[in-house]
Amino acid sequence: MAWERPLNNSQTPRAKNSSRRSLLPSTASIERCTYQLADGTFVTAEMPDRWMDRSQAGESLVAHVVTSKFCDHLPTYRQVQMFAREGCKLSESTLNQWVMEVGNRLVPLYLAMKAVVLAQCYLQADETTIRVLPEKGNNKKNMKSGTHLGYFWVYRSPGLNLPIFDYQPGRGQECPKAVLRSFSGVLQTDGYKAYDAVARDADGRIELAGCWAHARRKFVEAERSDPKAVAVILRGIGHLYAIEKIIRQKGASPEEVLRLRARARTLLDKARPQLEALLMDLRPKKPLRQAIDYTLKRWDKLLLYTERPELEIDNNAIENAIRPVAVGRKNYLFAGSHESAEIIAQLYSFMAACKIHNVNPTEWLADVLVRLPGAKPSDYPKLFPSNWTKTVHPHEGLSEEFFLDDLEAKPTTEAE
């Protein structure tokens, strides 16, 4: 409460509301399952479902640790320091064990979500690196600074808005081939040659679509050497994105999408001969020539989105899902093993899905760890972050005093 200074001595002071924000230390609680009655008798409540037998760590605690690492990019050693400041002594090995155990228990749910995503007829794909500590006896191939360079291959279903991270030790074409061996539909990529090999060996099952964000990036990189020509090209690409903005704002139907994108197709049909003519006037090593060459080689793939209303103009959504990995690896640096990298890929899949669907990842994980062991495979889709609804547990929100009062009450008998 604050007081305004009166204008004169006869004026009554007037109160006005004021507020300030404070930060309270985090708290941890211990759930007691045994209570003593007034007569000294001990009563033990029925044991609730637990995420891991013989573990004193509750679901909310391990969910907090996992979320802190994969959403907030806090390595476990830093979390140990933070817990210590709050008076909670934990070891880094304990936290790492929890993370691995959580990942292992989520494997059935991850495989179910992966199967659902790969069953769609339109996917986007991209990849990013992860450093992995080598196993004993590994050769020096693909090694740098004593670590192995592994890859997260990421597949996203725009229809479901679900991403899947898949860890592979390399970046060869055999990696996406193994994952996409049963996929049939449109695969949108940045033009990496491994995906061309996947489509070529798929017997017509896979059609490739291009990404205008990657094509635009090539021209941005050439802007310094040919600013005037690049400015014209970037303005033209900007018109394509302006049309997409109109589509999103209108919530356009598939028919309207095709009608609006027909304007984009007209612009592109006019642009191609101009790009081809400009290409002939540029030296081979000029960045602008390389940008035009990249675009023309993928022209049909870049046009495909104008013919299919369900396709997106670029791969930006999957890049947004991947971006937290880049921040995370700057903090925790590497995975401890290939097995750990697989677990990390699974957890990033769920954390990314929670972010996309505005789900609190800590609440989701704590709830799923309890529900998953008793769930049937047919119920797994209900636990995906995209479909999840929070479970209200029987004792949630009831204080310890409630139970004590209830237990201390005198029992009634039939005679009474």
Model segments located where?
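Short, conserved DNA-binding cores of transcription-related domains
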Residues: 1-35
